[in-house]
């Protein structure tokens, strides 16, 4: 099972651009399975566009080693090669003392070779020192190659090669990419601009990244590095239960998915379907009303960017307000459920207002516990999730919260998951993953 991790020496070295370019280049002749280490839900949409295969998250905070291996094998078993984009620097996780949440932990769990990606601007001999330090820091890792990004030119590359080969004759130099503003990618406060906002433009951009990779990197060398003999052991006993709880329900779930709402973990969709749910996607901006369904799932996104468009679709707002089934709103979906976003009218189901701030209000892995049974969890059960938002709720006139936050921020006073309409509607900031909250799919899909 061919696999390789593209790991940065730090953040902002070009991981998403170059990893996506590698995925696109390989996809011209191979069936590529993409992955993202960590909880990011935007980067995987670029991978998916590049490969036409849905990118998945591998996260050692949400998942234990058995679950990571199980998910990896599930999605990679019929593919030619898997490319895993790391998060931050290779060793960054939730603690300065252990691997949890890091790229290194995932690489070890799936026994994957690693190609280091380094911003080599103004570096020569220091590049060799960085590589030597990374290789010696953890002997369990298999760092096989290096890619230099943002080099000045051929003379710079030759010096880099000479320095690295002098101090480390084993590491493969996979290639180097020159400084080029066309390789940059648009960002905003929560990260990259999501793919649903720029489909045609993005397709051309990703093709350019792929062409650049083919021109500058040794693709055959990447395939050679990825070709490892070790098969990943997976405990197949109760394999569904090792990932998430499964109850055979028969519900129909309508999921908000457009330019305003698109922050989802696709494993959540799999978990819902394995629990018997039929999924249908709709646009709160463009569609007249919600589809015929039993449950609404309003995920995260950028409703603050599209607040006027959402507010103008009065038929959709009326349709959701009149819906008498279960509604789950997550982060952006929570904001949509409130009275307003920055003064622009929204659904007015949760009696509070959403405002945007200049500073991050929540950025953390989350550990929480359910105070009671609710539409996404069981009383006293714990869950692991993620939060990242610049918004906050004000004028809160609700006092029924479904879960309390032990690690993280929540809505207010370490509480999250506002519950209204006798628990039929829940809105919270924590982004739930079906592995981190194994009851998520079985509870949400239940009629």
UniProtKB/Swiss-Prot annotation:
Please list the GO terms describing molecular function: ATP binding; cobyrinic acid a,c-diamide synthase activity
SUPFAM superfamilies in the record: Class I glutamine amidotransferase-like, P-loop containing nucleoside triphosphate hydrolases
Q: Kindly identify the residues recorded as the active site.
A: 331
What are the EC numbers?
Answer: 6.3.5.11, 6.3.5.12
Query: Which part of the chain is the GATase cobBQ-type domain?
Result: 252-439
Keywords from the UniProt entry: ATP-binding, Cobalamin biosynthesis, Glutamine amidotransferase, Ligase, Magnesium, Methanogenesis, Nucleotide-binding
Keyword set includes Cell division? no
Q: In which pathway does it act?
A: Cofactor biosynthesis; adenosylcobalamin biosynthesis; cob(II)yrinate a,c-diamide from sirohydrochlorin (anaerobic route): step 10/10
Task: Provide the site residues for: Increases nucleophilicity of active site Cys.
Answer: 431
One GO biological process term is: methanogenesis
Q: Which cysteines are joined by disulfide bonds?
A: none
| Reactions it catalyzes | cob(II)yrinate + 2 L-glutamine + 2 ATP + 2 H2O = cob(II)yrinate a,c diamide + 2 L-glutamate + 2 ADP + 2 phosphate + 2 H(+); Ni-sirohydrochlorin + 2 L-glutamine + 2 ATP + 2 H2O = Ni-sirohydrochlorin a,c-diamide + 2 L-glutamate + 2 ADP + 2 phosphate + 2 H(+)
Domain of life assignment: Archaea
Required co-factor(s) are:
Mg(2+)
Please give the record's comment on domains. Answer: Comprises of two domains. The C-terminal domain contains the binding site for glutamine and catalyzes the hydrolysis of this substrate to glutamate and ammonia. The N-terminal domain is anticipated to bind ATP, and cobyrinate or Ni-sirohydrochlorin, and catalyzes the ultimate synthesis of the diamide product. The ammonia produced via the glutaminase domain is probably translocated to the adjacent domain via a molecular tunnel, where it reacts with an activated intermediate.
Its biological purpose is as follows: Catalyzes the ATP-dependent amidation of the two carboxylate groups at positions a and c of cobyrinate, using either L-glutamine or ammonia as the nitrogen source. Involved in the biosynthesis of the unique nickel-containing tetrapyrrole coenzyme F430, the prosthetic group of methyl-coenzyme M reductase (MCR), which plays a key role in methanogenesis and anaerobic methane oxidation. Catalyzes the ATP-dependent amidation of the two carboxylate groups at positions a and c of Ni-sirohydrochlorin, using L-glutamine or ammonia as the nitrogen source.
Q: Which family does it belong to?
A: Belongs to the CobB/CbiA family.
The entry's other comment says: The a and c carboxylates of cobyrinate and Ni-sirohydrochlorin are activated for nucleophilic attack via formation of a phosphorylated intermediate by ATP. CbiA catalyzes first the amidation of the c-carboxylate, and then that of the a-carboxylate.
User: What is the name of the protein in this document?
Assistant: Cobyrinate a,c-diamide synthase
In its UniProt entry, the species of origin is given as Methanococcus vannielii (strain ATCC 35089 / DSM 1224 / JCM 13029 / OCM 148 / SB)
- Print the organism lineage: Archaea, Methanobacteriati, Methanobacteriota, Methanomada group, Methanococci
Gene assigned in the entry: cbiA
């Amino acid at each position: 099972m061919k696999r390789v991790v593209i790991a940065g020496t730090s953040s902002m070295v070009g991981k998403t651009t170059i990893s996506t370019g590698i995925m696109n280049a390989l996809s011209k002749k191979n069936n590529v399975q993409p992955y993202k280490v960590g909880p990011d839900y935007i980067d995987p949409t670029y991978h998916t566009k590049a490969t036409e295969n849905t990118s998945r998250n591998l996260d050692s905070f949400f998942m234990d080693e058995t679950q990571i291996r199980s998910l990896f094998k599930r999605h990679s078993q019929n593919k030619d090669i898997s490319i895993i984009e790391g998060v931050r620097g290779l060793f960054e996780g939730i603690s300065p003392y252990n691997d949890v949440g890091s790229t290194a932990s995932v690489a070890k769990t799936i026994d994957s070779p690693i190609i280091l990606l380094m911003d080599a601007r103004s570096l020569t001999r220091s590049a060799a020192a960085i590589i030597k330090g990374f290789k010696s820091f953890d002997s369990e890792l298999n760092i096989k190659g290096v890619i230099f990004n943002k080099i000045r030119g051929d003379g710079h590359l030759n010096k880099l090669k000479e320095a690295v080969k002098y101090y480390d004759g084993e590491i493969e130099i996979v290639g180097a990419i020159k400084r080029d503003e066309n390789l940059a990618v648009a960002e905003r406060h929560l990260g990259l601009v999501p793919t649903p906002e720029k489909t045609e433009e993005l397709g051309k951009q990703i093709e350019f990244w792929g062409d650049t990779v083919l021109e500058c990197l040794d693709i055959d060398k990447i395939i050679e590095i990825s070709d490892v003999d070790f098969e990943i052991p997976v405990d197949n006993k109760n394999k569904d239960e090792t990932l998430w709880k499964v109850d055979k329900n028969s519900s129909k779930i309508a999921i908000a998915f457009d330019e305003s709402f698109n922050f989802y973990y696709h494993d959540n969709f799999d978990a819902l379907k394995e629990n018997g749910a039929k999924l249908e996607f709709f646009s709160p901006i463009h569609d007249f009303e919600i589809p015929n369904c039993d449950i609404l799932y309003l995920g995260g996104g950028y409703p603050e960017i599209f607040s006027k468009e959402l507010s103008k679709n009065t038929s959709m707002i009326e349709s959701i307000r009149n819906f008498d089934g279960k509604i789950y709103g997550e982060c952006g979906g929570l904001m949509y459920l409130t009275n307003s976003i920055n003064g622009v009218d929204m659904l007015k189901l949760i009696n509070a207002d959403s405002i945007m701030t200049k500073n991050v209000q929540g950025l953390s892995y989350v550990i929480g516990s359910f105070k009671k049974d609710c539409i996404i969890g069981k009383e006293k059960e714990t869950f692991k999730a993620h939060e990242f938002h610049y918004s906050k709720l004000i004028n809160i006139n609700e006092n029924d919260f479904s879960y309390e936050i032990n690690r993280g921020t929540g809505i207010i006073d370490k509480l999250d998951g506002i519950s209204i309409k006798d628990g039929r509607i829940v809105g919270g900031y924590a982004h739930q993953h079906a592995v981190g909250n194994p009851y998520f799919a079985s509870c949400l899909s239940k009629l």
